[in-house]
């Protein structure tokens, strides 16, 4: 009776998954319980129409876009819809002061005008396969955790490599699930010729910018259009003017029926990572170390960038993409830490862990193996706490901070003898970073971050440059930075050219920027070595915790954490109550765009071109108007998504495209750790008018 009560209490604390709309499900492993729940909510498609490794199915219309976003194929000639913020870096690369596609938008009026993007690819999933037995077959009982990891990694590489050996157009990737308790093979086909077809002005595609990011109500037209190209046999090919539009296996039909409150909807895409099974010790470390470091350091860096971007168009274009990426994670970290505190996530996790402790105590088999599980986890997180915190600030300050250091590290890692395709891509990356760099801004950033890092960490973790600054430059960080940039050849086109042309008279290791890069890598290595022992035990402990949770809740319908593999989430269109006395509707209209512009007259985040405002003010929306004569812009649902889902197709019950998922809401920013059914919402861009 006591055990039954414990389980009832624990289930109320830990919902994986207690809600019909929670979960990021593997399409190739949808069980009966999940399919039943989807049908009860309104799904009208059989499972083999969602995922079928032998016949075209809905999953064949969904792509991983560049490995960082998702997309959906919507035409027989390879058109792909994704989010504007997913295509933002591509638009930026093609922009200049003379052709400001970021500000004005871009449209290719013919296929000849479509713009190539060598850095981009789209990835189609062909099939998945459970390879757990084969991977874990390489593990021996006598192995310690490091030996186990090495054996597992080797077998994962072997299994993945077998796919390409059989067919060079395919890629096999084995991923770990449930903390390394299961392993699945995904077989992909990549297409590397992806061209920009259309992008709205940023005043539409980024309307609200940082102010509205992660916020509902939302009025952002966050979409871009690209096209996939292939060779004349419809096979993957690198960019060539001779390539032709790709003809996909499956094209997502676009809904003409719209939606209403309570309508079934599902996203299919590539969510990046979640930590739903992470221990309270891991959550606390994330909050206090990596998240706080991002908040502190990026806040300093971005303030400098933003000031200069607002003052000069050429700087705005150069820095737009990197500012956008940096600020997105910066605000995310702020929101996650806020949610952890406000929603009591740590307290909920600790209560759940207390119930697991009791369950372990009452089960002899579990007690023998796991009696010290939480004690060991707590001890090992404590043992690496200070080094982990310093490393988080170190990475943000120096590896993600001054771009001169980033250039030096890329040059240090460059391999002229590598595969030609890899060499060319790396060269382009170096040249592109250099072309988007303003040295005066970078010097100011470096100086500011040297000061900020010193304030945030113990003196034990100060790299050698601080001794140099103290001894040689009288403690003046700016003087040190000025001297570094003046004496390094990497800050000049001539120096970069000498490296790229492999000039034998250029002694690269004598360059002070390269020397600094080596010092930074050395310190990073030292930090990793200091944390190696506790980190190894933490990996083991979190894996064991993941396993015991699933054994304890045997009747629960579990899903694995997101890991950048294809997932499906489902739910219904619905609003929510963010706080007492307030209710948010489930959709927004163009009326809200006009209201926000009027309310933020001097705010660049809400600046919109007069011609766009004129179109919206006219009210001539044709067939896209609803029964009130309004045109809807965005809607929300209780689907379960995370980063990487940006650009994910939002389908209705028939598998027809409603729009694209592009964001989550501020009140549920802790959703990567704990799903909050009353608060968590997916923000979607609408492609068609609701009925």
What is each stretch, according to the model?
Residues 1-22:
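Bacterial Sec-dependent N-terminal signal peptides
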Residues 60-77, 182, 251:
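A conserved glycine-rich beta-strand in the N-terminal activation segment of trypsin-fold
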Residues 148-227, 506-632:
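Long, charge-dense accessory insertions within large macromolecular proteins
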